[in-house]
């Protein structure tokens, strides 16, 4: 991926914070003992609501889903509502493949107990995280229109914007889903 840094919006002068710039180790005060990478508390100061609008790729080990999880944990602790803009799963929602993550192997690139190709949208993942992991996040998911579970990205009629420099085409997302299993070997 590419580095995404904090900055200031040129039009409004409002500070912007990258969810990847300063991931911090949440440490032993977390309810669980796993390592939790969350937005820095100072990046949440003066926020009334956090709007999460990122394109996931339908694969357990794509980091936007983990970023969503830890963002949900952070805003829940800070009492900040979260709004997630739901987007199509580029791999569709009918095919679910691969084993579920073993809890003893959790990491930032393998967080939730979902199959490798999970078939969920980011909004559905947010609801799953909130319920399955008891995050207590004040969550609103803005539903999308026109997407059906049988649709792959090319069926959506939407322009493709690469979610990562390493995923330049819809076909690369499908390949990523299978080849990332080799990354840890």
Regions found by a protein language model. Give the residues of each.
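Glycine-rich, charge-decorated loop segments at or immediately adjacent to ligand/cofactor-binding or catalytic sites
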Residues: 83-105
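Conserved anion/nucleotide-ligand pocket segment
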Residues: 105-179
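Short acidic catalytic loops
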Residues: 48-57, 83-86
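Short, well-ordered, mixed-charge alpha-helical segments that flank or form enzyme active sites
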Residues: 25-27, 58-61, 89-95, 148-152
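A short helix->loop->beta-strand "cap" motif at the edges of active sites that frequently abuts
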Residues: 77-81
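Glycine/threonine-rich flexible loop motifs
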Residues: 56-68
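Glycine-rich oxoanion-binding loops at beta->alpha junctions
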Residues: 2-47, 59
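Hard-cation-handling environments
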Residues: 180-185
């Amino acid at each position: 991926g590419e580095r995404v840094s904090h900055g200031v919006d040129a039009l409004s002068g409002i500070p912007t914070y990258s969810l990847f710039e300063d991931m911090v180790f949440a440490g032993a005060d977390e309810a669980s003992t796993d390592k939790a990478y969350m937005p820095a508390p100072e990046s949440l100061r003066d926020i009334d609501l956090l709007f999460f609008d990122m394109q996931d790729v339908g694969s357990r080990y794509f980091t936007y889903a983990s970023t969503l999880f830890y963002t949900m944990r952070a805003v829940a602790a800070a009492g900040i509502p979260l709004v997630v803009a739901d987007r199509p799963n580029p791999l569709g929602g009918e095919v679910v493949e691969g084993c579920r993550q073993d809890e003893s192997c959790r990491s930032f690139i393998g967080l939730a107990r979902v199959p490798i190709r999970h078939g969920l949208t980011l909004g559905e993942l947010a609801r799953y995280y909130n319920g399955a992991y008891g995050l207590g996040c004040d969550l609103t998911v803005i539903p999308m229109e026109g997407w059906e579970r049988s649709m792959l990205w090319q069926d959506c009629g939407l322009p493709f914007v690469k979610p990562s420099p390493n995923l330049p085409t819809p076909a690369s997302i499908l390949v990523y889903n299978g080849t990332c299993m080799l990354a840890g070997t």
